[in-house]
């Protein structure tokens, strides 16, 4: 206001008439963002914020979807440390192409499609490096919106909460399909198949390739085959989000079985891949989006459009994480070490599942905890109610999302007894 008054006075002395609209604009600048309300907290990231603010020495965080060792500490894999050493002193800091590192993409495709995939050899796959799995999902959602504008996406109930945000912001209409059965704490297979059957022909479906987040419930191999056959009959498009390859069984090839089944049955699919979990490269944001096409010509066209979508979004992906992945996967010794380390992480989680279940049973819990060991991957869908989760937080300083999802990576030999006792206390009267 003072600046505006000074300009007005100076203009008046010179016989000039200032443009009132211009100064009205100056007066309103401070109110441009008055209508902006605080965004709701992310249901997952907000858990960690609350955990960090809690001064209690007994606090336990089983909400974060990141691997921790048995001391509750973040882990940098040895294969990653060695790759870092080899890259140290690199003078290459140039932009990557819009499609990212071709070497990293090629190596990544082999993990999903197979080392000897005919689709790779025949150049039928359009693939680009992305900003981890989230970026791959978002890029595909934008691609779907642009090139199948009247389509919608079917998303499982429940799913990773950000899936809904991704397709919503891409302005792709959403529908849901049955997945989890709350009473059996397993797969609601018949309802899932009914939803797939009743969806309009040629619908898009989001599928979790393995280690379903948040339930830890995956279809059996035979169920995947039935799903694939029904998709084929209905001409549906399957988009696989594979964020946890290796974390389900400890074997990345085995965890890609759902994808291989769909490929065997002749589907043209899309895949989101990420190295956040299975290489611990959370902050490096390394991922890949691939779309299997009819022929090489179509693959070239699709890739060019994916790059066109990426250009105004983030232009080109980051370099360092892609270099780490390439260094590990192209070296037989480092790749072998990585596979061993993936199995160690998966086995620790499997072991904690067994210990948690046994601890609850030894406490005399009236409930069945069989689902804790039946579910697989990083998460356990505990069956705890939002009210029980609130009690765990307020009375025992245990933090998790209110849907009862326990990150088994946050469970250690040091806190599993405390966690089991707290769960028993809030559920024993159920």
Curated annotation (Swiss-Prot):
Subcellular location(s) per record: Mitochondrion matrix
Cofactor(s) named in the record: pyridoxal 5'-phosphate
Entry keywords, A to Z: Aminotransferase, Mitochondrion, Pyridoxal phosphate, Transferase, Transit peptide
InterPro entries, per the entry: Aminotransferase_I/II_large, Asp_trans, NHTrfase_class1_PyrdxlP-BS, PyrdxlP-dep_Trfase, PyrdxlP-dep_Trfase_major, PyrdxlP-dep_Trfase_small
EC number(s) on file: 2.6.1.1
PROSITE patterns named among the record's database cross-references: AA_TRANSFER_CLASS_1
The keyword Protease is assigned to this record: no
Transit peptide feature, positions: 1-28
GO-annotated cellular components: cytosol; mitochondrial matrix; mitochondrion; peroxisome
Gene3D superfamilies: Aspartate Aminotransferase, domain 1, Type I PLP-dependent aspartate aminotransferase-like (Major domain)
Chemical reaction(s) catalysed: L-aspartate + 2-oxoglutarate = oxaloacetate + L-glutamate
GO molecular function: copper ion binding; L-aspartate:2-oxoglutarate aminotransferase activity; pyridoxal phosphate binding
SUPFAM superfamilies named among the record's database cross-references: PLP-dependent transferases
Biological process annotations from GO: 2-oxoglutarate metabolic process; aspartate metabolic process; biosynthetic process; glutamate metabolic process
Binding site for L-aspartate: 65, 160, 213, 405
Pfam families, alphabetized: Aminotran_1_2 (PF00155)
Oligomer status and interactors: Homodimer.
Function field: Amino acid aminotransferase important for the metabolism of amino acids and Krebs-cycle related organic acids. No activity with D-Asp or D-Ala as amino donors. In plants, it is involved in nitrogen metabolism and in aspects of carbon and energy metabolism.
Family, similarity comment: Belongs to the class-I pyridoxal-phosphate-dependent aminotransferase family.
This protein's name: Aspartate aminotransferase, mitochondrial
């Amino acid at each position: 206001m003072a600046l505006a008054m000074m300009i007005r006075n100076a203009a008046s002395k010179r016989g000039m008439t200032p443009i009132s609209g211009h100064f009205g604009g100056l007066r309103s600048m401070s109110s441009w963002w008055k209508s902006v309300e605080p965004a709701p907290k992310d249901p997952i990231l907000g858990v960690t914020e609350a955990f960090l603010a809690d001064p209690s020495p007994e606090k336990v965080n089983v909400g974060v979807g990141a691997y921790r060792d048995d001391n509750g500490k973040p882990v940098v894999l040895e294969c990653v440390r060695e790759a870092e050493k080899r890259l140290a002193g690199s003078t290459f800091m140039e932009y990557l192409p819009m499609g990212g590192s071709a070497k990293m993409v090629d190596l990544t495709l082999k993990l999903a499609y197979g080392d000897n995939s005919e689709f790779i050899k025949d150049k039928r796959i359009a693939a680009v490096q992305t900003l981890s799995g989230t970026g791959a999902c978002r890029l595909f959602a934008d691609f779907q919106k642009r090139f199948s504008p009247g389509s919608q996406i079917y998303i499982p109930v429940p799913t990773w909460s950000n899936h809904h945000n991704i397709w919503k912001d891409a302005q792709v209409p959403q529908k849901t399909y049955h997945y989890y059965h709350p009473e059996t704490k397993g797969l609601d297979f018949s309802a899932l198949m009914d939803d797939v059957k009743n969806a309009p022909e040629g619908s898009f479906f989001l599928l979790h390739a393995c280690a379903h987040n948040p339930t830890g419930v995956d279809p059996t191999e035979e169920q995947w085959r039935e799903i694939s056959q029904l998709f084929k009959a209905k001409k549906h498009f399957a988009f696989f989000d594979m964020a946890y390859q290796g974390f389900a069984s400890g074997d990345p090839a085995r965890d890609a079985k759902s994808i291989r089944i769909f490929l065997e049955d002749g589907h043209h699919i899309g895949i989101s891949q990420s190295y956040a979990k299975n290489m611990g490269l959370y902050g490096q944001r390394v991922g890949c989006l691939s779309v299997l096409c009819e022929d090489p010509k179509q693959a070239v066209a699709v890739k060019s459009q994916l790059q066109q979508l990426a250009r105004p979004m983030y232009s080109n992906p980051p370099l360092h994480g892609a270099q780490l992945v390439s260094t590990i996967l192209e070296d037989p010794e480092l790749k072998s070490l990585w596979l061993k380390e993936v199995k160690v992480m998966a086995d620790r989680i499997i072991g904690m599942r067994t210990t948690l279940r046994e601890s609850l049973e030894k406490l005399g819990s009236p409930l069945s905890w069989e689902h804790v060991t039946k579910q697989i991957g990083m998460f356990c869908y505990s069956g705890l109610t939002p009210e029980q989760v609130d009690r765990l937080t307020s009375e025992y300083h245990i933090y998790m999302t209110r849907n009862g999802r326990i990150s088994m990576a946050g469970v250690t030999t040091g806190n599993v007894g405390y966690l089991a006792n707290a769960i028993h206390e809030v559920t024993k009267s159920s």
